[in-house]
Amino acid sequence: MKYSIAILSLFAFPALANVEITGSVEAKCVIQTTKSGSYCNPIASKLSTTPADGGVLPIMRYDVSIADAYISSITHPTSFSSSPSLTDTLAWTGSTSVTQTSVAGMSAYEAAKTVVGNTTNFNLTLAGSTWFSTASSAVYGSAKPLPGGTYTAVVQASCIAK
């Protein structure tokens, strides 16, 4: 009998349980469109969002709740997402700037920004809100008039964790 109990105890299984652990994470960097941009056609061959040309700059607001954890990356367009048929090349220019801040120290973002190609990066070192505007301009061919129609381009804004 002792041997039977010993043999049976070898086949005994321990009790096991799988216990879930869940959690939710709220975004610590949120991007909102404050104002949509609008191209103006100051001369026949040019579209521009610059107010001096009659355009409207798009404005994006970054709300950051953790200081020094994110980089703002904003890319101005180098093509139209939709437009009439174009038979010649476009020369694109653009820039992104700090427009407004909720904390005085954020004004340093402008001087510290880095630009690579058509992408501007800002090191978001302080918690709070920062507004960025992006200028975009496209000149068609060798000063050819742009065909009539609706032109749309996209500014890409993202928050990159450090």
What is each model feature region?
Residues 87-101:
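Short, surface-exposed beta-strand/strand-loop-strand elements in extracellular ectodomains
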Residues 101-124:
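Extended, solvent-exposed segments with strong compositional bias
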Residues 45, 97-98, 114, 136:
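Intrinsically disordered, low-complexity regulatory segments enriched
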Residues 17-85, 121-162:
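N-terminal small/polar-rich segments of proteins
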Residues 1-4:
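Positively charged n-region of N-terminal signal peptides that target proteins for export
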Residues 7, 12-16:
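N-terminal signal peptide c-region/cleavage motif recognized by signal peptidases
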